């Protein structure tokens, strides 16, 4: 089964290694450095004291860079709406949630960098 058919039939798609090692390292380093330097600590539950960023220029460029690859895999044209990233710290828990209902029909989740054990993403 090709990616586009799987996406149409199941409503999700896993695209392994969509970012190269060096680009992934660069984006991950940017996220951690931005969190360390800028802070932008959020108080929103359930993520108190966790750095979060909306419309970060590097992430906006990453979105534009990945768009053709994701459109090709999904077999459809997509309209990017927003970028948002958060740097989780030890002890943080990401509960089941829906990404901004009404603002996005499809979401992309990327693990850019990690320390310690793998933190699974459930669909």
Identify the role of each PLM range:
Residues 1-74:
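Non-heme Fe(II)/2-oxoglutarate
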Residues 12-14, 84, 107-111:
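Conserved hydrophobic/aromatic beta-strand scaffold that supports enzyme active sites
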Residues 71, 75-76, 113-117:
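Short helix-capping and hinge/turn segments at secondary-structure transitions, especially at repeat
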Residues 75-84:
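A short coil-to-beta-strand element that immediately follows conserved catalytic motifs
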Residues 90-123:
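Catalytic core of non-heme Fe(II) oxygenases with the double-stranded beta-helix
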């Amino acid at each position: 089964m090709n990616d586009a058919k799987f996406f149409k039939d199941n409503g999700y798609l896993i695209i392994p290694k969509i970012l190269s090692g060096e680009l992934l390292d660069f984006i991950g380093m940017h996220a951690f450095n931005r969190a360390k330097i800028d802070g932008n600590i959020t108080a929103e539950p359930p993520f108190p004291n966790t750095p979060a960023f909306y419309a970060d220029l590097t992430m906006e460029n990453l979105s534009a860079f990945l768009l053709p690859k994701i459109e090709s895999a999904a077999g459809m044209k997509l309209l990017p709406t927003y970028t948002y990233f958060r740097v989780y710290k030890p002890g943080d828990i990401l509960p089941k949630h829906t990404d901004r209902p009404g603002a996005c029909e499809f979401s992309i989740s990327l693990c850019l960098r990690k320390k310690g054990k793998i933190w699974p993403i459930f669909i």
